[in-house]
């Protein structure tokens, strides 16, 4: 009897939460909801044997965390490409039409406001909320389950009698403008720090280690899509899927529309742009998605984004300010970037005091001088940049901006390759500015993987002039390391052990670690597999380099430029002298095998070897390794938790190999 009463109260409260938070249709006064809530809470305290973690009373109350655990996304949470004009949008549509030449009807889009919040993934197992994570880098996020459970419009249990066995909801967590203003008002009254804008407030609230604090913040969710779905037959359009989510208790934005044809899509964009200030929450554009799921799957993905969706951003907010000075920064590859030092100005929710001027060509194009009144905007509402100059306001004491001829850090000559806008320092690894970033790249996980040497340690080593080249890292001793801040005997021992371990590597990792421009992890692997030895790679001609898979004229020029610098050659020789070595890449003719000459895609997690090792084996089998599935793909090797690539391969009828079947080919 009591158990039934408790469950009925829970169902009643869930119903009213859904009516209030999702449908915006409250059916009872807040006071009545509070009465029911406290009645349930009292019964649960009196009868703890009937407690449930998914009860409406359990949204707040988990213990504070010491840190956030990592969560790997089974299906990557990709970002979106951007459009900033009608022309950009038309180009996006043309790319779609070029790929869908068999589709003769006009395209239908699901159009949504682009909320300015944080992307999250929420996993339901048999209808129960079991895990939530941030987007993170798209592959791995942070576990924020306890905090997500405190958000009132997110159901802890799906409102359906027949829930999917597994459902991953993806959406945006945000804060309304009214909630933001109230939060800041309360903070001011308490003498606490305020937030600059609703997005920062939402981010700070969602990443609180104490869920009780998150529970006091006015956060909301709007779902925009589905990741994993098992035990359910989903509708075949994006719009219908969002409506289905809404029917089972997941909040969806009320402004979403189905638009048939390009003009209707542009009408939606213009309408939302006009309504922007009256929506009650921050948006920075619209998201435009092909509605038909089958067409989405045919279009597929590029490396970081779907081909079937685009974010059409609103024009960035702009303000006037004064250019006080220009400083020239040096990046890891020697790129010289002019940075405008501005009179601080509030733009799009943040105070801007620096802005990029990109390069010397941009300075000339703008005809900008120190002392000018300039128009600054946050491109995409993120990166501040100067887009114009009010020349009529130029003061008499304005000073011309002189692009340096020598590096501001090491005084080496600055050069500019014909056809490139970027000027670069020629100092290579003798330039301290490049040195820090080059060393950080050298020790990184995908390069030499020296986990005992972190970014802060490298900064100390460079600033104290203890390390000038990567080879100097291997000359460090315990006494030297212990003189550095926060380096005791144990830390020094760990660092030296990491360095010793890193001396055994692979040719591919070593090439990648050198930081040659345009030579990424995959290209380094292709180079190592093709040339077999460092000597052959070093002496390869421009023409020989272009015979390597994925190496064109530009990459070949970068490689030859690297080896033509005596300083770089000296550093490489020193590294070898310090004991860097690797197993020989066997020079043997590719034996006949089912994968020879085929295009292969890896997906999922391999349990018996790393992804890089698997790529290396595939190249040795004479394969071309691709990062995406298409009609040109011959085989897909599927490890654990294989996601969208496996799904697409199945739909296209592509041959799929398990990890064990792949290993059998290597035997």
UniProtKB/Swiss-Prot annotation:
Q: Which InterPro entries match?
A: BRCT_dom, BRCT_dom_sf, DisA/LigA_HHH, DNA_ligase, DNA_ligase_AS, DNA_ligase_CS, DNAligase_adenylation, DNAligase_N
Q: Which cofactor does it need?
A: Mg(2+); Mn(2+)
Residues reported in the UniProt entry to bind NAD(+): 30-34, 79-80, 112, 135, 172, 289, 313
Active-site residue list:
114 (n6-amp-lysine intermediate)
Q: Establish whether keyword Ligase is in the entry.
A: yes
EC number(s) from the headed UniProt entry: 6.5.1.2
Keyword terms: DNA damage, DNA repair, DNA replication, Ligase, Magnesium, Manganese, Metal-binding, NAD, Zinc
Q: Name one GO cellular component term.
A: cytosol
Top EC class, one word = ligase
Family matches, as Pfam families: BRCT, DNA_ligase_aden, DNA_ligase_OB, DNA_ligase_ZBD, HHH_2, HHH_5, Nlig-Ia
Under the heading Gene3D superfamilies, the entry gives: 5' to 3' exonuclease, C-terminal subdomain (1.10.150.20), 6.20.10.30, BRCT domain (3.40.50.10190), DNA ligase/mRNA capping enzyme (3.30.470.30), Helix hairpin bin (1.10.287.610), Nucleic acid-binding proteins (2.40.50.140)
Alphabetically, the GO molecular function entries are: DNA binding; DNA ligase (NAD+) activity; metal ion binding
BRCT domain ranges (all copies): 590-667
Disulfide-linked positions: none
Cited function:
DNA ligase that catalyzes the formation of phosphodiester linkages between 5'-phosphoryl and 3'-hydroxyl groups in double-stranded DNA using NAD as a coenzyme and as the energy source for the reaction. It is essential for DNA replication and repair of damaged DNA.
Protein's recorded name: DNA ligase
**Provenance organism:** Histophilus somni (strain 2336)
């Amino acid at each position: 009897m009591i158990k039934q009463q408790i469950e009925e109260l829970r169902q009643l409260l869930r119903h009213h939460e859904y009516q209030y938070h999702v449908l915006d249709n409250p059916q009872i006064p807040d006071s009545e909801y509070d009465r029911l809530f406290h009645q349930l809470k009292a019964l649960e305290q009196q009868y703890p044997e009937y407690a449930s973690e998914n009860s409406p009373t359990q949204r707040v109350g988990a213990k504070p965390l010491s840190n956030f655990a990592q969560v790997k996304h089974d299906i990557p949470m990709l970002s979106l490409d951007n459009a900033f004009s009608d022309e950009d949008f038309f180009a996006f549509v043309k790319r779609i039409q070029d790929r869908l030449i068999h589709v003769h009807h006009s395209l239908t889009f699901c159009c949504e406001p682009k909320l300015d919040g944080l992307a999250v993934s929420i996993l339901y197992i048999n209808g129960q909320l079991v895990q939530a994570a941030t987007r993170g880098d798209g592959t791995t996020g942070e576990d924020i389950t306890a905090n997500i459970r405190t958000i009132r419009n997110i159901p802890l249990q799906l409102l359906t009698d027949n829930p999917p066995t597994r459902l991953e909801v993806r959406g945006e967590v945000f804060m309304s403008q009214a909630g933001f203003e109230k939060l800041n008002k309360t903070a001011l009254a308490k003498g606490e720090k305020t937030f600059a804008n609703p997005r920062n407030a939402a981010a700070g609230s969602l990443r609180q280690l104490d869920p009780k604090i998150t529970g006091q913040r006015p956060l909301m969710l709007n779902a925009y899509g589905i990741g994993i779905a098992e035990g359910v037959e989903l509708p075949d359009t994006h719009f219908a899927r969002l409506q289905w989510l809404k029917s089972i208790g997941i909040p969806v934005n009320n402004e979403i529309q189905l638009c048939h044809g390009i003009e209707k899509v542009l009408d939606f964009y213009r309408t939302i742009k006009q309504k922007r200030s009256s929506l009650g929450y921050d948006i920075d554009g619209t998201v435009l998605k092909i509605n038909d799921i089958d067409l989405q799957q045919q279009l597929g993905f590029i490396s970081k984004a779907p081909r079937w969706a685009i974010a059409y951003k609103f024009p960035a907010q702009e303000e006037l300010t004064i250019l006080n000075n220009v400083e020239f920064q040096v990046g890891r590859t020697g790129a010289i970037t002019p940075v405008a030092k501005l009179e601080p100005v509030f733009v799009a929710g943040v105070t801007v005091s620096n802005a990029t001027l990109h390069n010397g060509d941009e300075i000339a194009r703008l005809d900008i001088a120190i002392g000018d009144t300039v128009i600054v905007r946050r491109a995409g509402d993120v990166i501040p940049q100067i887009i114009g100059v009010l020349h009529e306001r130029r003061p008499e004491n304005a000073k011309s901006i002189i692009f340096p001829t020598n590096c501001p850090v090491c005084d080496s000559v600055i050069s500019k390759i014909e056809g490139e806008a970027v000027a670069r320092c020629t100092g290579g690894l003798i330039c301290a500015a490049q040195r820090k970033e080059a060393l950080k790249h050298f020790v990184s996980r995908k390069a030499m993987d020296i986990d005992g040497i972190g970014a802060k340690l490298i900064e100390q080593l460079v600033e104290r002039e203890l390390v000038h080249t990567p080879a100097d890292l291997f000359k460090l001793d315990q006494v030297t390391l212990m003189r550095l801040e926060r380096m005791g005997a144990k830390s020094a021992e760990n660092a030296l052990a990491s360095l010793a371990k890193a001396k055994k590597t692979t040719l591919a990792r070593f090439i990648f670690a050198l930081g040659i421009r345009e030579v990424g992890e995959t290209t380094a692997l292709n180079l190592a597999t093709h040339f077999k030895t460092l000597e052959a790679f070093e002496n390869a001609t421009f023409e020989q380099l272009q015979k390597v898979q994925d190496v064109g004229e530009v990459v070949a020029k970068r490689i030859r430029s690297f080896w033509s610098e005596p300083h770089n050659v000296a550093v490489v020789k020193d590294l070898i002298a310090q004991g860097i070595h690797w197993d020989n890449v066997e020079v043997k003719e590719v034996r006949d095998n089912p994968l020879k000459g085929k295009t292969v895609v890896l997906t999922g997690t391999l349990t018996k070897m790393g992804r890089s090792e698997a790529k290396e084996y595939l190249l040795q089998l004479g394969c071309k390794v691709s990062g995406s599935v298409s009609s040109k793909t011959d085989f897909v090797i599927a490890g654990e938790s294989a996601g969208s690539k496996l799904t697409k391969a199945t739909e296209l009828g592509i041959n799929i190999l398990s990890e064990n079947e792949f290993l059998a080919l290597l035997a």
